[in-house]
Amino acid sequence: MRESLIAQNVAMDSITRLAPAAGPLPAQRLDESGRAHVDQRAVLALALPLMANSAVQIILNLTDMWFMGRISTRALAAVGAVQWLVIVAVLVLGGAGTAVQTLVAQAYGARRYHRAAQAVWTALWAMACAAPLFVLVGAARHLILAPFGFDPAVEQLAAAFWFPRVAGACIGAAVWAMLGFFNGIGRPRTTLLVSIVTTATNAVLNQEFIFRLGWGIAGSAWATNVAQFLGLAFALALFLGPGYRARFGSHLTWRLQRSRLVQQLRLGVPMGLSPAADLLGFAIFQMMQTRLGTAGGAATQIVVILTSLAYMPGFGIASAGTTLVGQSIGAGARGWAQRVGERVILLTACYMGGIGVLIALGGPWVLPFFTGAHDADARPAIALGMRLLWLAAGYQFFDGLNLGASMCLRGAGDVRVPALLVLGLSLLLFVPLAHAFTFARGEGWVGFLPQLGWGAFGGWIAVLIYIMVLGTTLFLRWRSRAWQRIHL
């Protein structure tokens, strides 16, 4: 009986796919003369909960950094040295999860609801298969960190954080897959609810694991793992609830289909590789600053966290682009996808540019919050951080172009060329520039590059150049409309 029901649902999905979906298009408003306009209210109705969800992620990051600062400035620098690299590992190994929002949005726009639920289960199967790889990468902490030449005390702290954080990151990747489903069907408030539960749990467990149990820096990683596990359980309970079972057949599509898994990996791996390449460059950049000294590493980490006030909500707006573009394409309206995508890109760039300036203006009051007054490295870290915030403010508009364009391209399934562009710019432009600008002669990892010795300030000049080039390049890729020839 169940098999026949599944077959019937798949058949209905196939019939629906043959014709564009009827009804109004995503975020579309018709005026009195029948002309179509982008409904700004509809865009914001989707974007604002996603921005709020990103704000919750900011609170999570700030809470973690506050707990690290309570341990020591050295612990703060250690986490900063590996934080980006941890996310890179998750993006590369958890690529199938990042594809969920695109597949769900296009399936939802085409009214293929059971296909949308199937994308979630396929991602969860992929995460289960990849779990041993997460553990192996986590266990290789010393092999991965040794070549970067950290201060021994910083490396020891970073290694203590690395293993539990990476080994348990498959849980976080599974949570991303679940949230991608809710975002793809245009229900970001559910995503927000799951994130609030996870963040509140993480804050409580940080205090318990780090200080009361005495686990130190590793306790923060374990707190994140446990909190994400509870968030995953909560999201699954919602996904398998009566409403989703009735419309999406979420309880019927759990069986693994190899063809779907391969398709999702082909889409998800380059989709994960694009931000992974970007963050890999930032991870290496962060390690350069930590290699220079505790003050530079800590200042860079604090600035990164503060600029997330622009980045994370900007990511929320851009995520709305993935959903709106994907749903429009699923409905057979690629021209409308172009219009609504450009509106999202503009909103993202303007928001991030404005917030970047406000953060720099508020730096003198905010920076001291992240360091302990008793710490000898606190004062130089704060002084350097104030200068770095203005450099960071300079690239926020272009980072908005980068985020908005990349997420809209993701909604269209255009992921391979953008991944190659980001990989090339990150490793062939950004990393060499950061090395040349940061290190003086004899300080760096290699000797064949110019070594100007501008320190952390020089490294952030390289960030400014890189983001300006990257944002412009991806925006031109979107404007080229090459994505309109892609069919998933």
Region roles according to the model:
Residues 2-49, 104-170, 201-204, 210-269, ...:
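Short alpha-helical transmembrane segments in multi-pass integral membrane proteins
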Residues 51, 55-77, 145-152, 208-215, ...:
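Helix-terminus/linker motif at the lipid-water interface of multi-pass membrane proteins
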Residues 51-62, 85-99, 135, 139, ...:
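Hydrophobic alpha-helical transmembrane bundles that constitute the permease/transmembrane domains
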Residues 65, 73-76, 113, 188, ...:
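Membrane-helix interface/capping residues of multi-pass secondary transporters
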Residues 73-84, 162, 221, 294-309, ...:
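Small-residue hotspots at the loop-to-helix junctions and early N-terminal turns
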Residues 76-135, 139, 172-191, 299-363, ...:
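Small-residue-rich hydrophobic transmembrane alpha-helices
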Residues 393, 407-434:
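A late C-terminal transmembrane helix in Major Facilitator Superfamily
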